Amino acid sequence: MRCLKKKTLLFLLIFVSLNVHRTPSQEAHPARQRKPFFERLRRLEEQFQRFQQVTLTHLQNIANNYNVYHNMDVRFQSLVEQSQAVALAMNQSQAAIQGDVAHLKTWYRKSQRRSRKVDARLQALDLSLSTKSRQWVEKEGEQKAQREAIASLALSVQALQDALASLTQQVHSQGARLAALEGQTQSASSGTVALGLTTAPTPTQLAQRGPGSLQLWRDRQVAKSSPQHRSSPHDVTVHVQEMQKFQTPSSHQAAPPRTYQGPGNICNTDPVLIFPNTSTENVIFLSPGFLMPLRALSFCSWVRMATSHLGTLLSYATKDNDNKLVLHGRNSLVPGSIHFVIGDPDFRELSLKPLLDGQWHHICIIWTSVEGKYWLHIDRRLVATGSRFREGYEIPPGGSLVLGQEQDTVGGEFDSSEAFVGSISGLAIWDRALLPREVANLASGKELPTGAILTLTNVTSVGGFVQRAKCTCLEQCP
């Protein structure tokens, strides 16, 4: 651009100098030559103007081209910068990618090592599982054989339980009959007469004695006519001996022998405990309670009622259940009845109406978990029996045992409507089912059977208005 300007200026200077040198030579010519000169000058001026226009146009084109080139340079510079930025970003990305690739390679190597370890563990587990599966198959075979043996043993045990229950029922029935016969012989004879030497009474005589004696005579006649249903004395003796072998030894000493002073007189039965009213403070605690789980139970006592309803004789409560064992009476129940509760809410309603006459009576309530059988004896007579009551159940140890009140919590929350009013004497509890002869001996005033786990010697606390009375014979107590 600068070179072009210089050339244009140089051309103008040369042109002007030529025109200047021509002017003096022309002055000498005549005036007639001035006109063409001016025309030439005018044409030159027009040419110069055209040239100037062309030059300006050319210069404008050059300037425009320069601007285009300048813009292109700017754009190229921008593109260079952008390419540099892209290259930098590419370098950074490449560095990051290389780092990620290195990390992935490291992770891949670690994964390979872990996979090899896992493969080794899986192989070991597979081997162990195969070994255990073989052992499991062998154990399953052994367990199957054991289950078959257990099933066979259960059938044998069930058969033995059935046989034992049948024998126990026979022993109780035979004992009740023998006790009735002993009572008849004692009332009919003034001396001691052997049972085998007495003359069998006639049906007329038995009818005069009462319907119970006549029914007993009929049972004996049926037994004689049916030998297959008759139990010999030898069988009964053997069963009694077997039952005595399984009696649990007790830490309590046997009570002193009771003195039998004739019909209707029971003496030396332990102190008499008198509950005068329905106060909730009238309660007796026994300790220790049951030290071992009980699968059988015998509760026997002399009782004299002083009200028209039976109160609660005994209550055994644990933290899990406040009615694990209850002889529960209440003024809202049927007169003369109590609820025999084992493991609430199961119970059996027992009728004790003979006790409402205000006289002394001997009661024995017996229960065993074998087939859930239970028996109620009043004055040595079997008055009620049943089965399927808490079959297979165990009365747990460690609870609170009280007389005269029903516990709604362990050792408390008594209700006066459930309180016992009357007298108790000779109370004892066994962890086995007493035999009928043992029950008859108790009702006759003889010594306690061995193995009693609780008696009135275990009384640890007497509360409220409960009184202790020492009477030679029960009939003499107030």
Swiss-Prot record:
InterPro entries for this protein: ConA-like_dom_sf (IPR013320), Neuronal_Pentraxin_Related (IPR051360), Pentraxin-related (IPR001759)
Co-factor binding details: Binds 2 calcium ions per subunit.
All copies of domain Pentraxin (PTX), residue ranges: 269-473
Cofactor(s) the protein needs: Ca(2+)
Tissue localization of expression: Expressed in liver (at protein level). Widely expressed at low levels with highest levels in liver.
Expression induction or repression: Induced by lipopolysaccharide (LPS) in thymus. Down-regulated by LPS in liver, lung, heart, spleen, dendritic cells and peritoneal macrophages. Induced by TNF-alpha in dendritic cells and peritoneal macrophages.
Chief location category: secreted
An annotated Gene Ontology molecular function: metal ion binding
Subcellular location: Secreted
Domain of life the protein comes from: Eukaryota
SS bonds (residue pairs): C300-C364
UniProt keyword terms in alphabetical order: Calcium, Disulfide bond, Glycoprotein, Metal-binding, Secreted, Signal
Cellular component annotations (GO), alphabetically ordered: extracellular region
Annotated signal sequence range: 1-25
Binding site for Ca(2+) 2: E406, D408
Glycosylation sites: N91
Sequence positions that bind Ca(2+) 1: D322, N323, E406, Q407, D408
The protein's name in its UniProt record: Pentraxin-4
Species this protein is from: Mus musculus (Mouse)
